[in-house]
Design a protein with these regions (language model features):
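Conserved G/P- and acidic residue-centered "switch" motifs that form tight phosphate/ATP-binding loops
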Residues: 126
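PTP/DSP superfamily signal
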Residues: 1-22, 106-118, 133-200
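Short cysteine clusters
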Residues: 123
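Ser/Thr-glycine-rich phosphate-binding loops at phosphate-binding pockets of nucleotides
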Residues: 130
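Cysteine-based protein phosphatase catalytic domain of the PTP/DSP
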Residues: 40-118, 139-153, 163
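Mobile, glycine- and charge-enriched loop segments
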Residues: 2-47, 87
Length: 200
C-alpha cells in the first residue's frame, strides 16, 4: 500500500517542483468548472462549465471572454444567454486529442489582447486541448519554455501523446505540429477514450 502511494506521490511532487512557480490563484467563488486554474493573471483554464451557474460565476469573478476549444457542439447553452452575463464567446474548434494550428494560436493571442478582463480557456475536460493552447500562450508571451509548460500541463491531467509532443517543442517564434508518426500513434492510442467520451 505504501509503495503504491509513493509511486503516485513522488512523480506528482517532482512535476510540481520542475513545473515552476504555481499559477496565480483563481476565484474560489467559481462553481461547476472542473480543473479550474490560472494560467497567469490574464488567462484562466478549466473544463467546460457544466451549468449556467458556472458561466455566471465566471462572469462575477471577472471573466469577460470565454474561448471554447471544443470541435464537438454543445447545445446546452446558447451564446445569447451567455452574452447576457457579459461574456464574449470565442470559438476556436480543435478535435479532441489534437493540437491548435498556428492560426488558432494567433487568434487566441488576439482574443487575450482584446479582452477587457480575464479570459477563460476551456475544452471538454480542460486538460489536453486547453493545456496545449495554454502552453502555446505561455511560450508565445515569453513566460515559460515549452518543457516547463508541458510539465505544468502534466500536473493537471494526462494529455495525448500528440499534445505532449506539440507542447514540449514549442518555441516563442513558432508552434510546430508533431511529426506524422507521433500523430498516428497518438490518435490510435487515444481512439478508445475519444469513442467512449462520444458515447457517454
Amino acid at each position: 500500500m505504501v509503495v503504491g502511494n509513493l509511486a503516485i506521490l513522488v512523480p506528482s511532487l517532482l512535476l510540481q517542483h520542475f513545473a515552476g512557480p504555481a499559477a496565480p490563484a483563481v476565484a474560489a467563488s467559481v462553481r461547476d468548472v472542473a480543473h479550474l486554474a490560472a494560467v497567469d493573471t490574464d488567462v484562466w483554464r478549466g473544463a467546460a462549465p457544466t451549468s449556467l451557474e458556472g458561466y455566471r460565476s465566471l462572469a462575477a469573478a471577472g471573466v469577460t471572454t470565454v474561448v471554447d476549444l471544443r470541435a464537438e457542439p454543445d447545445r446546452r447553452f446558447d451564446d445569447e444567454m451567455l452574452q447576457s452575463f457579459g461574456l464574449r464567446m470565442v470559438s476556436l474548434p480543435i478535435r479532441d486529442g489534437q493540437t491548435p494550428t498556428r492560426a488558432q494560436t494567433d487568434a487566441f493571442l488576439r482574443a487575450v489582447d482584446s479582452s477587457r478582463g480575464t479570459v477563460f480557456l476551456h475544452c471538454g475536460a480542460g486538460v489536453g486541448r486547453t493545456g496545449s493552447m495554454a502552453a502555446a500562450y505561455l511560450v508565445a508571451t515569453g513566460q515559460m519554455s515549452g518543457v516547463r509548460a508541458t510539465l505544468r500541463n502534466l500536473s493537471v491531467g494526462p494529455p495525448s501523446l500528440e499534445q505532449i509532443a506539440f507542447t514540449i517543442r514549442l518555441q516563442t517564434d513558432r508552434a510546430e505540429q508533431a511529426n506524422m508518426l507521433v500523430v498516428a500513434a497518438s490518435r490510435m492510442l487515444d481512439a478508445p477514450r475519444r469513442i467512449l467520451t462520444t458515447l457517454l
